[in-house]
């Protein structure tokens, strides 16, 4: 696999905010090893062209390096860092946001037998594989369009569909395919994930989430753990702490108010859990974050 052209394209078109002129395409360029940072994964495919990255999801740790790709099929709270990056050899990554309706459309167009079989159990929310040559080739052709702006509107959607097709027919078909299936185990879990993200300040009972997801309580708990690598309560705690960190960037002097806003009844409990998650007390972190407003770009790219 020759990654030289991919590296050149990524280095040339990288921006500070990771955006590109192609909708849903992201580029990362990092020139130093980074301390662990907590964010949301996004639903995305990330391909590393140079360097290496490590992601922690619950108790699982994923490492991917040049020539490997990661698929995040659910928007999950993760902790990530680049483990190989320098000014002379920056880490370079490509990201493609995955949209369930587009995946569903491709599944409908596939002929019987076109897709490899998948196990019935819910796949993990994140998976890593070696990138096949045809996937890398399609990514390169998509990035070449950045040098031909006139062609982007017509050709970029076609090449993005090709990339999706390679993902659907590749080693991680199960994770990608379930994104587009309305009644898959992953889609049921994703329903609960969205509810927790939208109502993270509210308390809930697991049986209520199971009912919302259309599963028995035992099946829901088992599938939620399989996809997210954590319990629903721990998942909610991760979301609360991440939202609190975003709020502290703009409200650095109101730690008590922020803790209540994200659902904590006890400011001292909030401070303990915040320090455990981010390594520093919230007030100290707020002073460091002041005016920076941590972003919401997918963490895995």
Give the role of each language-model region.
Residues 54, 203, 252-253:
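Residue at a beta-strand N-cap/secondary-structure junction
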Residues 195-199, 246-250:
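Short alpha-helical segment immediately N-terminal to, or the first helix within
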Residues 65, 122-130, 180, 208:
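A ubiquitous short alpha-helical element
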Residues 162, 166-172, 179-181, 185, ...:
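Basic/polar phosphate-binding segments, predominantly the helix-turn-helix DNA-binding elements
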């Amino acid at each position: 696999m020759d990654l030289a052209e991919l590296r050149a394209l990524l280095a040339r078109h990288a921006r500070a905010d990771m955006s590109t002129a192609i909708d849903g395409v992201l580029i990362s360029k990092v020139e130093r090893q980074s301390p662990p940072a907590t964010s949301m994964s996004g639903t995305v495919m990330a391909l590393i062209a140079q360097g290496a990255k490590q992601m922690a999801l619950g108790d699982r740790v994923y490492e991917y390096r040049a020539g490997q790709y990661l698929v995040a099929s659910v928007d999950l709270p993760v902790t990530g860092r680049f483990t190989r990056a320098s000014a002379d050899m920056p880490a370079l990554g490509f990201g493609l946001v995955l949209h369930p309706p587009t995946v569903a459309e491709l599944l409908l167009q596939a002929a019987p037998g076109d897709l490899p079989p998948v196990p019935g159990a819910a796949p993990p929310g994140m998976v890593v594989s070696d990138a096949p040559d045809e996937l890398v080739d399609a990514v390169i052709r998509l990035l070449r369009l950045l040098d031909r702006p006139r062609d982007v509107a017509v050709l970029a959607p076609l090449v993005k569909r090709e990339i999706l097709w390679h993902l659907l027919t590749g080693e991680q078909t199960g994770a990608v395919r379930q994104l587009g299936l309305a009644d898959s185990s992953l889609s049921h879990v994703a329903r609960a994930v969205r509810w927790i993200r939208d109502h993270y300040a509210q308390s809930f009972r697991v049986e209520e989430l199971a009912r919302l997801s259309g599963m028995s309580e035992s099946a829901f708990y088992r599938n939620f753990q399989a996809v997210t690598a954590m319990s629903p309560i721990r998942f909610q705690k991760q979301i609360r702490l991440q939202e609190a960190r975003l709020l502290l960037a703009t409200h650095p002097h109101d730690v008590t108010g922020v803790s209540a806003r994200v659902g904590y009844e006890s400011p001292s409990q909030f401070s303990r859990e915040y320090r455990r998650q981010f390594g520093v007390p919230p007030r100290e972190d707020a002073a460091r974050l002041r005016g920076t407003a941590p972003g919401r770009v997918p963490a895995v790219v």
